[in-house]
């Protein structure tokens, strides 16, 4: 009779202990991003933020996905929110720096490149990102203050 009760919507002893489970939106978002479905990943990251509204790593990953879809302003906002929660997130400093360069905020970009290089990531690909950041910072410093201000006027 337990089977019939469950089929008909009755409450059997078996389903009293069953609790609804929430989806793991963060892992879903990461998988969608790996598949290249950035719009769906953004939706999943936003759903993950409902459960963990100020989680820096979710905010950082959302910012990465937003930047890949060309939504630079939202990406910048989410990188900044991530850094408010954890100022040591190297990836957030790195991503924010290059978005600020595109925007023309070269002084802000230099600040975030220095923060990234002050606490660089470790791992297999880390040297590639570190080298890229070092070159970008050298270029910014070589441009001097007058060129940096001119870059802001053109933005």
What kind of region is each of these model predictions?
Residues 98-125, 131-138:
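TPR/TPR-like (Sel1-like) alpha-helical repeat modules
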Residues 17-54:
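Alpha-helical segment of the N-proximal tetratricopeptide repeat
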């Amino acid at each position: 009779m337990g089977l019939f009760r469950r089929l008909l919507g009755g409450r059997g002893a078996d389903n009293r202990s069953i609790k609804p489970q929430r989806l793991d939106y963060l892992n879903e978002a990461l998988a969608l991003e790996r598949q290249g479905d950035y719009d769906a990943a953004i939706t999943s990251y936003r759903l993950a933020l409902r459960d963990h509204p100020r989680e820096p790593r979710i905010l950082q990953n959302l910012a990465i996905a937003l930047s890949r879809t060309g939504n630079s302003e939202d990406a910048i906002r989410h990188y900044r929110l991530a850094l408010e929660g954890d100022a040591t997130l190297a990836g957030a400093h790195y991503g924010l720096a290059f978005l600020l360069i595109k925007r023309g905020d070269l002084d802000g970009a230099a600040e975030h490149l220095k923060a990234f290089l002050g606490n660089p990531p470790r791992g297999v690909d880390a040297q590639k990102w570190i080298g890229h950041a070092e070159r970008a910072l050298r270029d910014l410093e070589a441009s001097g203050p007058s060129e940096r201000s001119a870059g802001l006027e053109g933005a």
